[in-house]
């Protein structure tokens, strides 16, 4: 997509050269400067976090989900990168601790989707939501407001569409 940086939009995350546990500990130290608390969400944000081998992903996710301070595993990905095996893995992880999957939709308008090089059509998104929900996994949808050439009406149509989907959250980005 044209809106991701070379860091996969995870420019403020801990170094990917660190282990998952080391990244969690670094994140805890960073957040302790502003917030108090002892419960955290392990958020796999940068890049497409279901685009790797099943074994590799399972190792990463298990390291995060078994950390004693992690309460939720949140995974950002593309709807077209959810194979049956990945969905089964997420379902199994969801039995250990809650799993949220953040799907990058950005917009329902195909012209805008082509402009940002989203790479898949709306039915792929709808199928991903359906498959995740069948497995009891909560879905958060990432949208981008005010894409070039989109009107206020276009934005409202995207939000109205999402209001009729079986999703549990919307991430709005300007």
Where are these regions (language model features)?
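Conserved SAM/AdoMet-binding glycine-rich loop
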Residues: 34-117, 127, 134
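Loop-centered beta-sheet repeat module
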Residues: 107, 118-122, 141
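Auxiliary alpha/beta "docking" domains used to position bulky ligands
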Residues: 17-30, 45-46, 50-51
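Generic structural signal for well-ordered alpha-helices
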Residues: 21-29, 57-62, 87-91, 125-129, ...
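Canonical Radical SAM [4Fe-4S] cluster-binding loop centered on the CxxxCxxC motif
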Residues: 1-19
